[in-house]
Amino acid sequence: MRTNRYIIIVFLMVLWGQLVLAQTPEELFKQATESYNAAQYQKAIDQYQGILDLGQESSALYYNLANAHYKLNNVAESIYYYEKALKLNPDNEDAQNNIVFAQQMTVDAITPLPKTWLRGVSDCFISIFSLQVWSILPILGVFVFVMSFLLYYFSQKTIFKRIFFTLMLLALIGSIGTYFIADFHKKSIESQRYAIMFDKATPVFAEPNAYGAEMFSLHEGTKVEVIDYLNDWVKIRLADGKIGWARQTTLRVL
């Protein structure tokens, strides 16, 4: 009985110690930021990574983690986490600015293919708002439609009926139009998978094996589009249209 009592006491002490040492993500974030401000960048990276290990993520977390990697000249890691920050919040201006500096450390100079006039106009128009805003606009249109209908129904004067009827039509057209834009925007984002090259130098082959012809090589930090997978190989496409196969271990999907 006494032995069991000691075991229980030791177990409770260990459990209590774990509870005392346990830290919330907010506390870890604060400590990581303090480490970063003290120029202890590797320590900050470990602490920010600890928050990710807890299953927490945010645009600010990825942004700070990218900054710490940038300070240590970790090209691939900094670009990867800036991209992650922008994926969660495309309007993160700090990440938009800093990723440009990080990309200047890359070796590969890739000239994107020119867009067609129609594609350029559509991309420019869609980029006016984020996906979240486009998703809200159809709901707002329905609300305006309902309110206009009620005002139209209870109005006595003809001029007011005409005004509210016009608003009804505009709200209906706007709601339907923005719904399809939001749906197109969402599917476009979901259909595109990107990755960042992490190896110092990666050979890209014409076929998903190392026996085929080596077409070109890529270096750390280069962003590629993921097209397909086969075993431990991944088919990638560059912004300039080049296509090839690289090993999955050489890149990290966003």
Annotate the PLM regions:
Residues 37, 190, 197-226, 231:
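Beta-loop motif signature
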Residues 111-152:
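Membrane-embedded alpha-helical segments of integral membrane proteins
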Residues 160-183:
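Internal/C-terminal transmembrane anchor helices
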